[in-house]
Amino acid sequence: MAPRQSKTAKRSKVQNKTRTVESEVGSDSAARNLLMSQPKLTPKSIVKAPSKAAVKKQQAKIRLYGARSGKEYREDQLDIPALNKAITPGVKAKKGKKGKKFVEDNDALTLNRLVKSINDKYDQANESKLEKSRRLDEIRELKKQELERKEEQKENKLEGKKNEVKSKASLARANRRKSAKSQKNEESKAASNKGKKSVSFA
């Protein structure tokens, strides 16, 4: 059995209760209904409407200098050069459309390939499977020829460089031989001049 509490203990227990503030909206249904019927009050706008004098002044300016264009440009659209930026020497930033490839006028192979591949989008609606496969084969063949030509150009360039290096080396070798020969001749002349005795008659 629990021990009996004294009157003072009971009183202190009741007095030390924490008070809670409960809103009427939660407890009172009438208050809740009143709140729901209230219109939504929007805060006053901070932007003031211009005065008549200010409007007149603005219109006078427009008449004098013309209206400003409403379009506002960002910094990246204005193409302003960036300051305090480290510029790497010898590297030029590419401008314009990326992936632009120019074809030479006399390059019939590439032109044919491009024409055939461009028509691919528009011709597929009214062509049979056989025609399509034939055309795709043609495009593949043209691409293969282009690759072969590129490889050939690479090989030719490499061969040209090799020949250039070889010719430079042979030229240097020939120069070295010439200089060595001329040096030997000079030495032999000097030695023969030393061995001869000159006699002068008075």
Curated annotation (Swiss-Prot):
Keywords: Coiled coil, mRNA transport, Nucleus, Ribosome biogenesis, Transport. The keyword Transport applies. GO terms for molecular function: mRNA binding. Residues 111-176 form a coiled coil. InterPro entries: Loc1. One of its GO terms (cellular component) is nucleolus. Residues 145-167 have a biased composition (Basic and acidic residues). Residues 1-43, 145-202 are annotated as: Disordered. GO terms for biological process: intracellular mRNA localization; mRNA transport; ribosomal large subunit biogenesis. It is found in: Nucleus, Nucleolus. The keyword Coiled coil applies. Residues 7-16 have a biased composition (Basic residues). Component of the 66S pre-ribosomal particle. Required for efficient assembly and nuclear export of the 60S ribosomal subunit. Belongs to the LOC1 family. This is 60S ribosomal subunit assembly/export protein LOC1. It comes from Debaryomyces hansenii (strain ATCC 36239 / CBS 767 / BCRC 21394 / JCM 1990 / NBRC 0083 / IGC 2968) (Yeast). The lineage of its organism: Eukaryota, Fungi, Dikarya, Ascomycota, Saccharomycotina.
